[in-house]
């Protein structure tokens, strides 16, 4: 159990997808203007990562890995296209659920919801799972933790950006300039977790 808690804490804080690897920055910067929208997208990314990492773990171990189907047959060259296909299917299902049951959030996320399919944070989580050779329970914990870490980062940035509306930001830094600086400072703060030995 201690191993899984360590993996979860590492995925959320030490190896944060947004602030340690800078993955998923397009939606991270574009949707972080309001906390409510950022939280909704964070939940969507967490759900997609929490489902797609274990689902792709099963596909990788049962179909793509060397010798999984037939001894001597290695289908790992199909990793990228297969992983993206599984992620796309999961995002489509999530999009239909949000459209049906949460139309306000669906409209607020707009084009960024289908773009979760090609969000490099999602693909990065799946790729790290395959590269680090996580087993199925580890992939569940890692997928959920990576999503929670990305959500924590985008909600924190949205909170900072909402506060900055009332700050006296120099004209040359308004908009994305101060957002990049804020993201960099947040990343520096999260680097302090790198010294934590888990």
Swiss-Prot record:
Its EC number is 7.2.1.1. It is a multi-pass membrane protein. It holds the Pfam family Rnf-Nqr. Keywords: Cell inner membrane, Cell membrane, Ion transport, Membrane, NAD, Sodium, Sodium transport, Translocase, Transmembrane, Transmembrane helix, Transport, Ubiquinone. It is found in: Cell inner membrane. It catalyses: a ubiquinone + n Na(+)(in) + NADH + H(+) = a ubiquinol + n Na(+)(out) + NAD(+). GO terms for cellular component: Gram-negative-bacterium-type cell wall; plasma membrane. The chain crosses the membrane at residues 11-31, 35-55, 77-97, 109-129, 140-160, 176-196. One of its GO terms (biological process) is respiratory electron transport chain. The keyword DNA damage does not apply. The keyword Transmembrane helix applies. Belongs to the NqrDE/RnfAE family. Composed of six subunits; NqrA, NqrB, NqrC, NqrD, NqrE and NqrF. HAMAP family: NqrE (MF_00429). This is Na(+)-translocating NADH-quinone reductase subunit E.
């Amino acid at each position: 159990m201690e191993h899984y808690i360590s993996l979860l804490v590492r995925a959320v804080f030490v190896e944060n997808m947004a602030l340690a690897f800078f993955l998923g920055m397009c939606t991270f910067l574009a949707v972080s203007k309001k906390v409510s929208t950022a939280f909704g997208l964070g939940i969507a990314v967490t759900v997609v990562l929490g489902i797609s990492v274990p689902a792709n773990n099963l596909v990788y171990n049962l179909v793509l890995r060397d010798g999984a189907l037939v001894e001597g047959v290695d289908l790992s060259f199909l990793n990228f296209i297969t992983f993206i296909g599984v992620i796309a299917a999961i995002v489509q299902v999530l999009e239909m659920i949000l459209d049906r049951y949460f139309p306000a959030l669906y409209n607020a996320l707009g084009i960024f919801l289908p773009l979760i399919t090609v969000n490099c944070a999602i693909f990065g989580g799946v790729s790290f799972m395959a590269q680090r050779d996580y087993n199925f329970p580890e992939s569940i914990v890692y997928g959920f933790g990576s999503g929670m870490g990305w959500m924590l980062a985008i909600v924190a940035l949205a909170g900072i950006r909402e506060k900055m509306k009332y700050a006296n930001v120099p004209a040359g830094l308004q908009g994305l300039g101060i957002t990049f600086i804020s993201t960099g400072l947040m990343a520096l703060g999260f680097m302090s977790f790198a010294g934590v030995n888990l």
